[in-house]
Amino acid sequence: MSEVKFISPETIEQALDAYSKSSKEGKTKILAGGTDLLVQIRSGISQPDTIIDIKNIKELKEISNDNGSYTIGAAVAGAVLDEEKDFGNNWPGVLEALRLIGSEQIQGRASLGGNLCNASPAGDSVPALIASGATVKIQGPEGERNMPIESFHVGPGKTNLKNGEIVVNFQFPKKQKHSGDAYLRMIPRTEMDIAVVGCAVNVTIENDKCVDAVSYTHLTLPTR
């Protein structure tokens, strides 16, 4: 492996500045938990010359609750979010998905932002995020923008992030009354495997109709 430059900014502005400069010079990767990136580097799939570690950015590790509407920082580890009882009471399906990402040790590092940006069709958190109606806040050289989770991916390993952009946080809407969410996956083995099929639901009890489908990217299927 050739020499890799490691940058650890403390603010979003510092991260964006470093990203802008380094991306012009070569291949740059953002590091949150590193559970996917480090494996990709060791296997030779990814060969960055610069790594920007965003774990020291306070805003990206914050969790807030505004009258039932939650904002979760992109670098919040799954194990940390799992300890938020109020969030779990509102969005148990999201936590069900996070608890399926690797071992307890992996969950201590793996983040929502990393699982989303890895853009794997087998990513457990993504269907649950889509079903919840969550949006993602993105920041880059051109400013800030918000995007529905279902619009984030364009294919396996590919996202709608523009050059120099990073994911800042996830915004969850206030849960509707008489609603519930859940996540379930099918795997070849009993433990520690990636999903062959993952399904998330967010149901408001009104009508009794169901629609199903499978797609190479995550798909939202409203019912009537």
Predicted regions and their residues:
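C-terminal structural segment of proteins
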Residues: 1-219, 224
